[in-house]
């Protein structure tokens, strides 16, 4: 490679990305940059499966705990931060290892951000009124009809992105998918090596997701959400509190669901998140996928990286 290289390690939730990243960092001259839209928030530790203090001591992660849950962090913010952090790491003679499951961030970094129309306040009021009358699920069905690819990537309980996809279509007559495909790649000062890790069997991933959610409940996830609930300045519609698990437990605290129902919905939402992440990964070009259950996972990943940089 003529340019320095950056390694991107992707994968669905609960696939073993963090464990592999820490192992790689201990065997190679890597520094880790988190690619996770939930890990940026301070105090959101249990429900995001934030790496433990022990793991962070072994392999520090950049772009973790950088903003309050009241604040907003966009894909554009991530691109700026990731490029800056990568250049800092490269200047030290080390290799950036970008690790996470927020595929939109990886996509924005590698393929650029599309030039889409500005938000239209009047149209947004109309869409919000429709949602209040019919529900966001009905608007998601509408999106499914004219842009099924975007609908597969946007959850019905993600009103911000759902509203934007409908707004863009009504303003331009073109789908969000159209704009994604028109993106202009950012001119990056480094090459990308793309890898993903996941179990070969989908059932194994589903079991991991369910077990991790129950483990998080045992670790005090409900108390963590309750702390945010009682702050008074956060709402369920903010990006931070829309994160998987937080939204469902917030609804329990609001009296909408019984706790057992909220937990069930949290597990289902986690599996749906994994499905959307896998949808992104299936269309990713030049991606090497590793089995997270392989006993030789670390040497296999290191050998692949070395084969790419020769």
UniProtKB/Swiss-Prot annotation:
Gene3D superfamilies to which the protein is assigned, alphabetical: 1.10.20.140, P-loop containing nucleotide triphosphate hydrolases
SUPFAM superfamilies: P-loop containing nucleoside triphosphate hydrolases
Role of this protein: Catalyzes the transfer of a dimethylallyl group onto the adenine at position 37 in tRNAs that read codons beginning with uridine, leading to the formation of N6-(dimethylallyl)adenosine (i(6)A).
Protein species of origin: Marinomonas sp. (strain MWYL1)
GO terms for biological process, alphabetical: tRNA modification
Marked site (Interaction with substrate tRNA) residue numbers: 102, 124
Top EC class of this enzyme: transferase
Name this protein carries in UniProt: tRNA dimethylallyltransferase
Pfam family, one: IPPT
Subunit field text: Monomer.
HAMAP family listed in its UniProt record: IPP_trans
Highest taxon of the lineage: Bacteria
Family: Belongs to the IPP transferase family.
Catalytic activity: adenosine(37) in tRNA + dimethylallyl diphosphate = N(6)-dimethylallyladenosine(37) in tRNA + diphosphate
Alphabetized InterPro entries for the sequence: Dimethylallyltransferase (IPR039657), IPT (IPR018022), P-loop_NTPase (IPR027417)
PANTHER family: TRNA DIMETHYLALLYLTRANSFERASE
Binding site for substrate: 13-18
Residues engaged in binding ATP: 11-18
Necessary cofactors: Mg(2+)
Interaction with substrate tRNA: region residues: 36-39, 160-164, 242-247
Molecular function terms, GO-annotated: ATP binding; tRNA dimethylallyltransferase activity
Keyword tags: ATP-binding, Magnesium, Nucleotide-binding, Transferase, tRNA processing
């Amino acid at each position: 490679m003529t340019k320095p290289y950056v390694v991107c390690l992707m994968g669905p939730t609960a696939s073993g990305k963090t464990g592999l990243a820490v192992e790689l960092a201990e065997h190679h001259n890597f520094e880790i940059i988190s690619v996770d839209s939930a890990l940026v928030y301070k105090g959101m530790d249990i429900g995001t499966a934030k790496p433990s203090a022990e793991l962070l001591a072994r392999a520090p992660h950049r772009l973790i705990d950088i903003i309050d849950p009241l604040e907003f962090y966009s894909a554009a913010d991530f691109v700026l931060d990731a490029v800056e952090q990568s250049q800092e790491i490269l200047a030290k003679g080390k290799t950036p290892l970008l690790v996470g499951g927020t595929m939109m961030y990886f996509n924005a970094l590698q393929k650029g951000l599309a030039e889409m129309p500005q938000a239209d306040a009047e149209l947004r009021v109309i869409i919000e009124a429709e949602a209040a009358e019919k529900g966001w699920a009905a608007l998601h069905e509408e999106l499914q009809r004219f842009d099924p690819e975007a609908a597969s990537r946007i959850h019905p309980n993600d009103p911000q992105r759902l509203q934007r996809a409908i707004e863009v279509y009504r303003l331009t007559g073109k789908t969000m998918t159209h704009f994604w495909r028109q993106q202009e790649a950012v001119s990056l000062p480094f090459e990308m090596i793309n890898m993903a890790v996941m179990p070969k069997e989908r059932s194994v991933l589903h079991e991991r997701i369910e077990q991790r959610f129950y483990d998080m409940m045992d670790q005090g996830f409900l108390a963590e959400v309750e702390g945010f609930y009682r702050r008074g300045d956060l709402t369920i519609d903010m990006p931070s509190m829309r994160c998987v698990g937080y939204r469902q437990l917030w609804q329990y605290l609001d009296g909408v669901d019984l706790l057992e129902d909220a937990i069930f919905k949290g597990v289902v939402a986690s599996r749906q998140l994994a499905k959307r992440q896998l949808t992104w990964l299936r269309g990713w070009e030049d991606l090497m996928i590793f089995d997270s259950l392989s006993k030789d996972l670390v040497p296999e990943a290191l050998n692949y990286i070395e084969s790419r940089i020769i």
